[in-house]
């Protein structure tokens, strides 16, 4: 069974998971035998303690299932830059709640767009200061 199918069958129909994305080397075809598996999971829960417990629970189980080192990221608390990479280069393998995923994406894209503006402003300011010799 391929790693994509294995991940999909493992996480499908899990009530506490909204969506699962594969990202990193396995998503862009650069994986090697020693590569780890990077998964981003959307739980749709704002309680960091509960999300961390679920990450721990699923990390052990999916690592055993895949027989690979696996890294899990909670999309619920991921930064804008990481979310941008997950949405841009990741592969969505599981959607258990399409409405919650659509809402999360709408909110995340809004934050990513705002963050991009402020990051650009900050970078322009830094470059200007360097050019001025400060």
Please tell me what each predicted stretch does.
Residues 1-19, 27-29, 33, 46-134:
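Catalytic core of pol beta-like nucleotidyltransferases
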